[in-house]
């Protein structure tokens, strides 16, 4: 049996990895198109996990037996979520997009409450979500002017929200229906097949890059591929653990904009700390500490 502290530690590690995606994706999209870049990234991610799964024959057999779970996770988590995320982000200001995407823990909590009989909304959870979203808004406003105006931006918001819903349903499916499939097999196959689908979509709708791509692009692609392989494998494993609630686990995604903002201050020349951003970071940190205040600090390093 895994301790709650152990689950929290690995959830934080996965979210810290995901927080590096925003800056890295911006670098990659300077040289490549969204669907093509995402497709190649996830194909590589799926292949990177393969050596850590099981024997080839058992791998194929497991996918054949659990093909419905693999298909749903591939479709919802990779294809629908990332297609809508990339396209929606192009239609809205960066700050607004960050807020909408940052509301993912709220969407997941609501969907989990509807689909999972043991994962209901509680007052404590709702308060944590409200403070978490407030923190995301402050971080986003502190980094960029918050605007909402055109109908096209509303379309972008709906696309990002729909992607959040797809992620939520996928998380619930993994929690309820994936107990008979190795989490590394699930992450490897869903990332690989999802990457192929995204790449195939890119062929008729995107022109693709012209000329050779620089070393910077390939290094960025390799990092994003490694990051996705590691983070998704950890997350799928955590979702399968007995007693882990989808909504509670996803509360840790509120730290993604916190660490993302911190990384931007270190990496991006024009980015610097603002009092609104720092306030948002503090609010998110305090809300998570209060929610998990009954978890002993020492358990964070147990059973790793």
Regions picked out by a protein language model, each given a short descriptive name:
Residues 40, 96-103, 173-195, 228-266:
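Helix-helix packing/entry segments at the starts of transmembrane helices
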Residues 1-39, 149-176, 184, 196-200, ...:
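Glycine-/small-residue-enriched transmembrane alpha-helix faces in small-molecule transporters
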Residues 49, 71, 111, 123-143, ...:
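Hydrophobic transmembrane alpha-helices of multi-pass small-molecule transport proteins
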Residues 65-72, 121-133, 181-190:
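Cytoplasmic-side transmembrane-helix entry/capping segments in multi-pass membrane proteins
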Residues 3-7, 31-39, 62-68, 141-166, ...:
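Juxtamembrane helix-entry segments on the extracytoplasmic side of multipass membrane proteins
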Residues 17, 21-22, 53-101, 138-139, ...:
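Specific transmembrane alpha-helical segments of multi-pass solute transporters/efflux pumps
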Residues 31-80, 105-111, 166-170, 187-206, ...:
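Transmembrane alpha-helices of multi-pass small-molecule transport proteins
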Residues 28, 37, 41, 88, ...:
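Hydrophobic/aromatic residues within transmembrane alpha-helices
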């Amino acid at each position: 049996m895994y301790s709650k502290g152990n689950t929290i530690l690995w959830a934080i590690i996965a979210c810290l990895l995901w927080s590096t995606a925003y800056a890295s994706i911006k670098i990659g999209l300077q040289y490549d198109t969204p669907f093509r870049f995402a497709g190649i990234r996830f194909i590589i991610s799926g292949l990177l996990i393969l050596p850590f799964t099981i024997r080839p024959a058992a791998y194929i057999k497991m996918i054949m037996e659990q093909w419905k779970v693999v298909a749903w996770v591939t479709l919802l988590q990779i294809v629908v979520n990332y297609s809508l995320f990339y396209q929606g982000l192009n239609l809205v200001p960066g700050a607004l997009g960050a807020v909408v995407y940052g509301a993912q823990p709220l969407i997941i909590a609501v969907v989990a409450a509807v689909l999972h009989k043991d994962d209901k909304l509680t007052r404590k959870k709702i308060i944590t979500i409200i403070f978490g979203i407030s923190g995301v808004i402050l971080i986003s406003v502190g980094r960029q002017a918050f605007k909402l105006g055109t109908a096209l931006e509303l379309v972008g918001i709906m696309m990002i929200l729909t992607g959040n819903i797809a992620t939520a349903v996928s998380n619930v499916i993994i929690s309820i229906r994936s107990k008979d499939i190795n989490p590394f097999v699930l992450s490897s196959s869903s990332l690989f097949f999802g990457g192929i689908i995204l790449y195939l979509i890119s062929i008729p709708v995107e022109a693709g890059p012209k000329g050779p791509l620089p070393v910077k692009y390939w290094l960025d692609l390799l990092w994003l591929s490694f990051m996705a392989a590691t983070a998704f494998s950890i997350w799928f494993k955590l979702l399968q653990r007995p007693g882990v609630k989808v909504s509670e686990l996803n509360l840790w995604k509120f730290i993604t904009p916190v660490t993302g903002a911190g990384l931007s201050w270190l990496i991006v020349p024009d980015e610097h700390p603002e009092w609104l951003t720092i306030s948002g970071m503090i609010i998110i940190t305090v809300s998570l500490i209060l929610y998990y205040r009954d978890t002993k600090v020492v358990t964070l390093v147990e059973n790793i």
